[in-house]
Each structure stands twice: as structure tokens, then as C-alpha cells.
Amino acid sequence: MKKFLSILSTVVVLLLASCMGGTSKSGTGGAGGEVTGVSGSSMQEPSPYGMVLVKRGSLKMGTESTDSLWGKDLPTREISVDAFWMDEHEVTNSMYRQFVFWVRDSIIRERLADPAYGGDESYKIEEDKNGDPITPHLNWNKSIPWKNPDEDQQRAIESVYTIHPFTGERMLDASQMNYRYETFDYATAALRKYRLNPAERNLNTDVQVDPNEEVMISKDTAYVDDEGIIHRETLTRPLSSMWDFVNTYIINVYPDTTCWINDFQNAENEVYMRLYFSHANYNDFPVVGVNWEQANAFCNWRTNYLIRGLGASAKFIQRYRLPTEAEWEYAARGKEGNELPWTQEGVKSDKGCFYANFKPDRGNYTEDGSLITSKVGIFSANSNGLYDMAGNVAEWTSTIFTEAGVLSMSDMNPELYYNAAKEDPYALKKKSVRGGSWKDPESFIKSAWRSSEYQNVGRSFIGFRCVRSQVGTGAKAAKGAKSSGGKTRRQRH
């Protein structure tokens, strides 16, 4: 009898399962018991403002020629990169000033909510709509009273400005323009040796797992002391939770405007130091004096700024970041893979017009029409739709600089990222810089040319642009490849 009931219950379960199988495309069922997959939800990724899509492809990275200075063979390798969005031109003074002003306004809002400046609680949100406590954050929907502020509000606003002791000029206090942000280190968290579950750290079943093994991990943290000085520390401690993969940074984001003096001593460049970043006449010129750390901070801010603007629809939007060295060269070479971003030979047309802003001859900076930087986008774009990939300003990449270059990386989406700790030797803080600049000769503006700079140094000839990975798009199927169900199936060769 029990056996009969068991068989009967099994039949009932199978019947119910077959009834539930259906033809649902969004649930767990499949047509006729076949596994058809779960469609899930998708969204059409909007084209990012001011960016162009660089489609996936391959190239021979590097150059076959020899280093003309040292006579060394330069590293080359066949590599492939996935599709990504890239700024059509370098980040401009106007764009970067928006970042600096956002930092300024965030400081003012913090102080408007501070009891020492009147304590207007409406500038900081600490409860949700139901009155439950939440992580405090600034209220950006409430305007700063720039016009007709009361006494406390005026003190809060003026607190971010300073007066030049000689000229009496009211200036933004650059030393206060600190941006704090956090990042989650997905790459480190994915490594087996850092798994929180000890059993997942080694898949070799012949190896005895020690459940009490102590795994040490390093993470970056930062704070500002009472004197306003930023202190960065790299902590090494036992791995205990996912929070150990969160790094905290505080970066002073104001560009080093003194780079115009320090880069070119015994030159009359004071006007650039005082006005290049702040004057409206330079709005559309590439921002300079921004170091690698500041460029990364800009990318983080730009990501969060977009997410706040898009709201819930930003769930699958990829973060803004600096391009890898491989992405930069691939994008610069254009669809033809040229040595220079343009298709023609040489650096100027038959009419004598230059294709880029660089140093055409010894002591001659102006033959191409500019003495220093030029407005972005005044020269023709390459076949990828990108401007100024040669000359104007050299550009930061995310990649650490090594002599081996691409030879020390994977041949798929190659990257060599190293987050140097404060205690690391200074030599480990070099990052790869690409593209050449307004001060460089022709040989230095070629797409494969590599140079370097320390990550905490801003130069008058180095800027940057951002990229964003494209959310997965498949390759086009080969013509005539059909499955029995009539759906196109990709052929592999």
C-alpha cells in the first residue's frame, strides 16, 4: 500500500511539473521540458554624451621600429580588446571645473548643515520618507543661497574662499577642494586566495583545508587631520569580511596650475599659471596639471554624477575610467591600424596644413598654429571619430609603466594595473602616458609611442580622457547559419 501511494505521489508531481512547464520565456520553465533559458530583463544602453563607440577588434600593439634614442627593440604583440565608449576629445577645463565646483558646493552644503554655521538641517538628509534613520547624505535639491544669504550662510560660503595677501583677489581655496570616494576591488575579491570561505581557496582535493588559516589583505584608507592635511595609509590586516575589499581615497582635485612654471623654468609662462584653468577663454582647451590620482577621482565623480541623474535606469551602466594602454593605442590607430591617427602619410597635407598640434621643428612650436595647447577638436577626427589622439596633450592611461609593456600582459583585454601603496618605492608609481603633446616632436606623437609619469605629478602637457566599457553585444552571425528552429546561429570557424 505504501509503495502504491509513493508511486501515485510521484505521478502527481510529474503531472504538475508538466503542467507548469508551459512556454514561459521569463520563468524557469521550458517548452515541452526543453531547457530554453531565462530571458531576464535588458535595457538599451544610451549613447554616452560626448563619447563615441570603439568597436571590438585586434591589432599588433607596439611598433616594429627600434627606439631611436636608446637603440632598443620596442615590445610588440598581437592583442584583442572588447568594445568601449571613449570621450571624443580630452577632458576640457570647463568639464573639470564642473567637478571642482561640485566639490566646492558639497563643502558649502556640509557647512550650511553644521551648527557652527547656523545648522540648517535641510541641507543634509538623515531619515527616509518613513522617518527611519539612513546614512546621512547631502540634499542637492536645496539651492545654496548665493544671493542675499544671511550672516551664517555668508560665513559658510566665504569659508571656501581665501584672499590673496598681495593683490587682495578673492580666490577659491584650492587646499580645501578634497574629494572623498570609495571603490570596491572586484578583481582582488575574485582571487581564490582571498575567498572568505577557506574551502574555496584551493580546489585541489588532495590538499587539506585549514579552516583557521589567517589570510592577510591590504586596503587603502585616508583621512584629513585637524590641520587639513590628507593622510593616506595602506592597512594590512586579516581578511574578515567583504568590507576588506573597499578602498577609501581622499584626493585634492584642484589642478597644479604651477606646472606651467615648474615644467618650463626661465620662460614667461606666468599668464598660463594664473589664467589657463580659470579664464573662460580657455574653457574648451584640455585641462592640464591634473595627475593620475586626480584623473581617477574625476572618473569616479563622473560615474556617480551620471547614476544620480539616471536614477533606477542606471543599474547596468558601466563606470567611467581611464583607458588601458591597449585600449588607447587601439582607439588611436583608427580602423585602419595606422601608425598615426590619420590615413595620410606624414604630418601635414599637400597644402601644408598640419594634422595635429605638436612641435614641428627645433624651437618652432607655432608652425601648426598654436604655441601651447589648442582648443580640443579643431583638427580632424580619426576613423573612430576621436579627436586629438596625437599631440595637443599626452594622456594618462590606467596601466602601470614597465619596460616589457604589453609582453607582461594578457593578449585579451591586456592590462597591468598596480595600485601602489604609500610605502612602495617611487619607481612603482609610474603610469603609462600616451599620445605625445604640443611640446613633442613628430616621433613622439605616434600611436605606439610610450612614455611615463609618476602618478602624483601634474604636467602642463598631460591631460586625460575617459572610457566606459560597453555592456555585452554579440558578434553578427554568419549569413545562412540557421538552426532547426529558424533562429540565426553563429558559425565558428
Predicted feature residues:
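Functional-site microenvironments in short loops/helix caps that host divalent-cation chemistry
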Residues: T23-A31, L53-V54, K60, S65, ...
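C-terminal motif of bacterial Sec signal peptides marking the signal peptidase cleavage site
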Residues: L16-S18
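Sec-dependent signal peptide recognition
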Residues: K3-T10
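Short capping motifs at secondary-structure boundaries
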Residues: F84, V91, V100-R111, W301-G309
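Short, structured beta-strand segments at or near domain termini in extracellular proteins/domains
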Residues: S460-G474
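Short proline/glycine-enriched turn/loop segments at secondary-structure junctions
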Residues: A420-P425, S451-G458
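Non-catalytic, alpha-helical, charged scaffold/linker segments
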Residues: A116-E233
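Post-signal peptide N-terminal segment of mature Sec-exported envelope proteins
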Residues: G27-R56
